[in-house]
Amino acid sequence: MPFPHRVTPRVSRLARIVLPLIPFALAHVSAQSAPPPPPPLRLSDFVVTPSRFGVGERTGTVAATLTQSELATLPQIGEDVYRALVRIPGVAADDFTAKFWVRGAANGKLLARLDGVTLIEPFHLKDIDGALAIIDLPAVSRLDLLTGGFTADYGNRTAAVLNLETDFPASPQPATSLGLSLSGVRAAHTGHFAGDRGRWRLTARHGYPDLALRLEGRDDELFPRYYDASFRADYILSPQHTLSLHALHAGDTLKVKQKNDPELNSDYTSNYLWARWRANPNTRLAGETVLSFARLDTDRRGEGAFDNTLALKLSDQRQLNTTALRSDWSLELSPHTLLRTGFEATHHTSAYDYQLLRDNYVVQNGVLTVARRTADTHLRPAGDRFGTFITTRLQTPGALILEPGLRFDHDSATGDDDISPRLAAALPLSARTTLRASWGTYAQAQGLHELSVPDGETRLNRAEVAEHRIVGLEHRLAANLSLRLEAYERLTRHVRPRWDNTVNLYNIFPEIQSDRTRLAPSSARARGVEVLLERRTQRGFGWTASYALARAEEMLNGRAVPAARDQRHTVRLEATYALNTRWNFSASWHYHSGWPTTEVSYILIPLNNGKRYAQRVVGPAYAAQLPDYHRLDLRATRRWEFRRSQLTASVDLFNAYNRTNLIGYAYSPVVSGTTVKTSREARDLLPLLPSVGVTWEF
């Protein structure tokens, strides 16, 4: 039974909570000195869609912008760009992974681009659900995160868009940066060529989180290592044309040795090579064209026995190759009319070679025996994908800005042809207040790399289709104080069936676990209200406060089931204090309702020999709930300025008051005579983790 595609009474109640806040917020302005009006923006720079958050040195053209230098002073772990985004309303993730969820949607429903190229699963240590992103945070100069309602420029994703841009230092002189922390080292160098017409940058990282784990006494069975390197060279062909060449290589290895369990050895690599042409032939016409090649390789091997009895032998080798051409252009037809159009064509091939031998206990005719399961799958799917769009931004005489758009996407591998109409609108109510709204449909075809071959899948599913409904209000209360209110609803049909480990997500052999469950929702719905209040300053005290009331659920067999990262209530408080240009202190407190989880019980099965076997029974998916989560992170940053260099040191305390937060429970049977009870032990997230980092720039 699908969710009804209408505004539900609960959504109406959410609106009744939020809307009365607006006049109170606006009334507060009368007690403030009116801030100066912002400089006039060109129509192409105006933010029309709601649900847009930015990080960059440029402010004013992106709502709720945070500068890169400010982001660098906030508490963080691993200097990871994906982990840093968890502070944005609507974004959720646990301590172990960088793969954040957006308004109840998994990270695979997010489109990520770096300098114009689409990234595919851009994470290190995928056996730990992607512990870190393959992008070096200091290299990112600007980003936009669109948590919903994005325009027709973006296709083949149903939830969100993340645009990341790198840039060169303001100084044209060569520059070098070296960084060292407990978990890794990094280096970057920027130079120039062809006089002042060409610039290049090389960055490299090598991580050894296993050493940090040893120092913390956490785990002596994990041996993770990762590395990545990126290169960019820009050449100014003329004042109106710039050509850039880019390369990104990332790899990681993981060895897991557990006593009385099989050993895992995995190796992942990602390679991207692309060229980008950016053109501004005149003041009215602008565009870019990107030609890219990508290859992802997976080599995952496991061998041994559980309890020295149940054998396991696993070989999982995969490869994905893509060639893509994308071209987007915008034309200013008049000061009040902007036309954008473009296309993207992709050819992709993939390979799956999967072999499994697994022994399990089974009871047959009252006898406990060992049954062997085997799998031997070899697939070579391939296909082409094509998308095109057209959108027009119109400014009416009454200051209302409309952006209707239409998108078409074709995927030969799945046979999908999807037409997606979209509409965004922005109405400046005053120099300080803007009302925004968006509606549209969004289709996402299953990627060739997304087949769950270990679970027996050999055919791709049809495209998912989501409908977004969003309304938002942004108001500047004072020169450095702003308020944002948003209400959203996302309805999804043709939801793709998937396999979840509903009890323990973090298992190095997920496909053989008893909690591996096929979930085939008939529909899905996410809705909520978000409030963001922030005060930003270059000096002194700045802060941010946000609250989100949300619900994300799926319809399974006629029952509404919460999504795996459903967070009913989320609160985040952040504060920074710049004592002077040398010292900066920051704190971040995060709270959210406990995530859904799945309970386990045991039953006793009598055997012919008079003994009993404790059979594990996995309960309904996500029918239970974990305790609430909260933690405090702290960071202190100190800078030393020298004649030709700068040294920056930082000290972080992750989970400063050592809160025990849970990711789930480990279950075991306790047998007493003819009865069995279920014992559960908490599985913790990260404890108090101190870390130190040093960066030298010269």
Tell where the protein language model's regions lie, with residue ranges.
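Surface-exposed extracellular loop regions of Gram-negative outer-membrane beta-barrel proteins
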Residues: 354-356, 363, 427, 431-470, ...
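Membrane-embedded beta-barrel scaffold of Gram-negative outer-membrane proteins
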Residues: 288-292, 296-298, 428, 463-521, ...
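Short strand-turn segments of transmembrane beta-barrel domains in outer membranes
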Residues: 130-133, 141-151, 158-191, 200-206, ...
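Gram-negative outer-membrane beta-barrel transporters
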Residues: 396-399, 491, 513-599
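Periplasmic N-terminal accessory/gating domains of Gram-negative outer-membrane beta-barrel systems
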Residues: 45-150, 161-168, 184, 530
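Transmembrane beta-barrel wall of Gram-negative outer-membrane proteins
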Residues: 181-206, 219-253, 265-293, 333-337
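C-terminal beta-signal and adjacent terminal beta-strands/loops
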Residues: 582, 590-612, 627-631, 637-698
